[in-house]
Amino acid sequence: RSPRVFWRGEVANHAAHAGKRKGYPCKSERGNHARLAALALMADDPSHFDVKCNVGCEARDATKWPCPGLAYDATMRKIYADNSSIRDPKFYTEPDYANYKYVLNLPGKTDGSYSRNLNHLWYVGAAVLLWDTPAVEWYYPALKHGATHAAINRTTARAVVEALDASPDKYSRLLAGARRVQKELT
């Protein structure tokens, strides 16, 4: 398995809806912001992260459409200006995900289910990393950081992955936890 964290998906720009809603729909932006932050992990540390857009990759213009609490850091601004390094047009299936040691779940779009992507991650044989987000799925109460998954964000991701790499027991616990979630909850 590749020792990196894997994710593929979309960052969608909601600017087309701004005129209809009298301003940028910042309430719909949390998932995109998390996705752009995860893409910044790849830009900063490709040896640990294989996180790319394979569909749309059009982030919000944070200067034109600022959203409270959703500012971009320097790497995120760089990606906004030129996203060529974090694009991958290939479509990946579950066997492709199984080639990675870690799989990442990021918040989804408000017009789709967050759990739709997460449901297939539990059974690919990799440790599941969940982006730390206020979004809650129906089975989240049954999940426990360190037992079923590891929670990460922009600032903790690398340290969490390095700690799991340094502890085969913790990593094995996450694999067993993912199998349990797949068997009992999905």
What are these regions (language model features)?
Residues 91-186:
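Catalytic binding pocket for nucleotide-activated donors in carbohydrate/polymer assembly enzymes
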Residues 1-86:
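Phosphate-/polyanion-interacting regions in eukaryotic proteins
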